[in-house]
From Swiss-Prot:
Name under which the protein is recorded: Phosphoenolpyruvate phosphomutase
Organism: Streptomyces rubellomurinus (strain ATCC 31215)
Pfam entry (one): PEP_mutase
Reactions this protein catalyses: phosphoenolpyruvate + H(+) = 3-phosphonopyruvate
Gene name per UniProt: frbD
EC numbers, comma separated: 5.4.2.9
Family under the similarity heading: Belongs to the isocitrate lyase/PEP mutase superfamily. PEP mutase family.
Pathway the protein contributes to: Antibiotic biosynthesis
Length: 276
């Protein structure tokens, strides 16, 4: 089974899969060993690994290289976070050609204007017009060479302060333009607008994807009951690694020794195993 077929099966309506946000080959292998179904090549994670904001700073080539390493390091399908598609329809078409050629299973593009800002930060968010983003999706689908390559349309209506009716209108238009799945994003604390969207979505043949970063009390099972088939845990691995590295390194500088952290860190044999 190809990785693209694996991704299509993972997001198919009727089941519930989970994806881990990863930012390099090591985090990809750890996610695979933990039992995740899909890898999310996180734009935030890749940007953070380069110590730059998630604001369209890195180039497509840099994001693609990170996704390629993840793909080559594991047996799991990679769904790549491609922000707004790195430009207009021509840029989107080239992006699809490059990602598909690299073996990536699918891409996700969001309906914000370029350059984008991270959805969970402060400040206003500007959405692309429905027609403009639909044209990008159509260009993406026209550019793909294999039938099973996946293009996910990410809707930022709730992030931009919009209402469910706009989100559904956008979803309908994006599916008509060729989107294989819809990702609806939100930074609500309770996730109720996401669950409401899922229950209101009438296209039962089109998969729904959620990213429960700001509403962690909503479980994957809760999302499944509302009609979703993929939950992306987009940045938890990144945040966990920051906490662990910070605590360990501060302990070393305080003690002038690594003795007290040794029971808390991975053994070298575990590192070697991850380099298999």
């Amino acid at each position: 089974m190809t990785k693209r077929t694996m991704l299509r099966r993972a997001i198919a309506r009727g089941g519930m899969s989970i994806a881990a946000g990863v930012h390099d080959g090591l985090s990809a292998r750890i996610a695979q060993d933990a039992g995740f179904d899909v890898l999310w090549a996180s734009g935030l994670g890749i940007s953070a690994a380069h110590a730059v904001p998630d604001d369209s700073i890195l180039t497509m080539t840099e994001f693609l290289e990170a996704a390629r390493v993840m793909n080559d390091s594991t047996d799991l399908p990679v769904l790549a976070d491609c922000d707004t598609g790195f430009g207009d329809e021509r840029n989107v078409a080239r992006m699809v050609e490059r990602y598909e050629r690299a073996g990536i299973a699918g891409v996700c593009i969001e309906d914000k204007v370029f350059p984008k800002r991270n959805s969970l930060g402060d400040g206003a968010q500007d959405q692309e017009t429905i027609e403009g983003f639909a044209a990008k999706l159509a260009a993406a689908k026209k550019a793909q060479q294999t039938d099973d390559f996946v293009v996910v349309a990410r809707i930022e209506t709730f992030i931009a302060g919009g209402v469910k009716e706009d989100a559904i209108a956008r979803a309908d238009a994006y599916v008509a333009a060729g989107a294989d799945a819809i990702l609806i994003h939100s930074k609500s604390r309770d996730g109720l607008e996401i669950l409401d969207f899922g229950r209101s979505w009438q296209r039962k043949d089109v998969p729904l994807v959620a990213v429960p970063t700001t509403y962690p009390a909503v479980t994957a099972d809760d999302l499944h009951e509302a009609g979703f088939s993929l939950a992306i845990y987009a940045n938890q691995a990144l945040r966990a690694s920051i906490t662990s590295m910070r605590e360990s390194l501060r302990q070393i500088t305080h003690d002038r020794s690594s003795l007290r952290i040794e029971p808390k860190v991975a053994k070298l044999s575990e590192v070697f195993e991850l380099q298999r």
